[in-house]
Amino acid sequence: MSSKSRRAGTATPQPGNTSTPRPPSAGPQPPPPSTHSQTASSPLSPTRHSRVAEKVELQNLNDRLATYIDRVRNLETENSRLTIEVQTTRDTVTRETTNIKNIFEAELLETRRLLDDTARDRARAEIDIKRLWEENEELKNKLDKKTKECTTAEGNVRMYESRANELNNKYNQANADRKKLNEDLNEALKELERLRKQFEETRKNLEQETLSRVDLENTIQSLREELSFKDQIHSQEINESRRIKQTEYSEIDGRLSSEYDAKLKQSLQELRAQYEEQMQINRDEIQSLYEDKIQRLQEAAARTSNSTHKSIEELRSTRVRIDALNANINELEQANADLNARIRDLERQLDNDRERHGQEIDLLEKELIRLREEMTQQLKEYQDLMDIKVSLDLEIAAYDKLLVGEEARLNITPATNTATVQSFSQSLRNSTRATPSRRTPSAAVKRKRAVVDESEDHSVADYYVSASAKGNVEIKEIDPEGKFVRLFNKGSEEVAIGGWQLQRLINEKGPSTTYKFHRSVRIEPNGVITVWSADTKASHEPPSSLVMKSQKWVSADNTRTILLNSEGEAVANLDRIKRIVSQHTSSSRLSRRRSVTAVDGNEQLYHQQGDPQQSNEKCAIM
């Protein structure tokens, strides 16, 4: 019995009893009398003494039992109170956790929606950029075509101008010939007028000579009539004289009559012969004078007629030449007018084309500026969204780490694949290393743990291109396979790049290719120069197309292209860096996460998709 009491007195308290034991509820007990005093003062037997000792021990045991029972009752009361408090706290924590979870899920849904909208906007922007790039290339091709047509039109204009100048020279020559012919015509007209006057004078002289001839003929006729009349008178006088003489002679001696008749006949014959001779002489003189005058008049008339015919022929030929020259001049003037009209039309068309091309270029530049502004704005918005998303992903990662820590502390082992958990943890660690995180305090709240059921990994290769230039010459485009490098002069002045070098490096210290431009190479405003590798089938057409003799551009995933001036200073560069974007998708009963990691040392992104599923599993935080 004594050993039992001793074992009961040394019993340990129940687990969880951390408070100090209170004194028993009974009143203070008197100290037990010592054995020596009892032995000395009471003459009791050893049996009674043992009974008293047992009684005292039982009293002590009863007191300790009462104290223990009271303590147990107090602990039960405290336990019930603490149970109520724990239940109240648990309900409060559950309610707060549910509210925070709902708010967080709403924010996640909103963020997911914003990310989806951003992805759609980015895809739409990329499609629009590609479409606008194609439209820009098409407009550039049209602009090149129009420029070629404009160059052809300018060549035609120059050709037409040269032809117009030739026609103007011919026209001036024709005008000079026309003036000369007009002068010749005026001289011919003057000569014709003089000949006309001479002809008039000749005709007047002819008329006068004709009148003189008529007068002479009339005079001759009058003389003939007068001669005839005189002959008649003479005959009558002779007859009268003969009659008188016969009358007289009839009265004279018949002897002298025959002699006198013979003498008279002889005298009459002589007189008649003399008159006839004189008349013949006069007739011959008049006839000779008349014939000479007529011959002179005929010769003068013939000369006048010949000169008149010659003048008329010359006038006719001159008129024919003048008409032909006038017709030629009219044709040349018409052709010149047509050419001038054509030149004006071509100049107007050229001006319209230049104005239209200028307007198209202005519109394209405005559109490019607007697209650049939109791209800048979208990139800024995308960067803001990415910052927000990264912050949310970091919050999610911190929350997940807290859950993992609580599960590890409480020895809760989720049923998951080890490789998937390691990959997911590695992604979380990479995200924590790569991105500056905002520390989330570890609050002692209840959280739901994610039980991963399945996961999936994807990797996509992408290239990042960045370019910069100090001057007007920039590296516009490079071929990933190393076929060509294209330079572009974005300024409005011609740039001489003779002696400049174009280098292409692999990983800064790897193999490289260097091409040095000829000293006479120049880039026109808005001009493009393409440097081709030697193994391509491009044609060497300087200065726009240059083919290297024996070199070819190096190609790799990470390349850097540099343009050096004659002093060795870098004036333009273009970097092309390969990025591997890995996607990790894991689904669980509570959540579905997707992590996207860009393995180029720049960024690591995490996305969470899907609605969290409800679970009855809880984590008790003491």
UniProtKB/Swiss-Prot annotation:
It is found in: Nucleus; Nucleus inner membrane; Nucleus envelope; Nucleus lamina. Constitutively expressed in all tissues (at protein level). Expressed in spermatocytes (at protein level). The modification Phosphotyrosine is found at Y249. Residues 266-408 are annotated as: Coil 2. Residues 242-265 are annotated as: Linker 2. Residues 429-440, 605-622 have a biased composition (Polar residues). The record marks L289, D353 as: Heptad change of phase. This is Lamin Dm0. It comes from Drosophila melanogaster (Fruit fly).
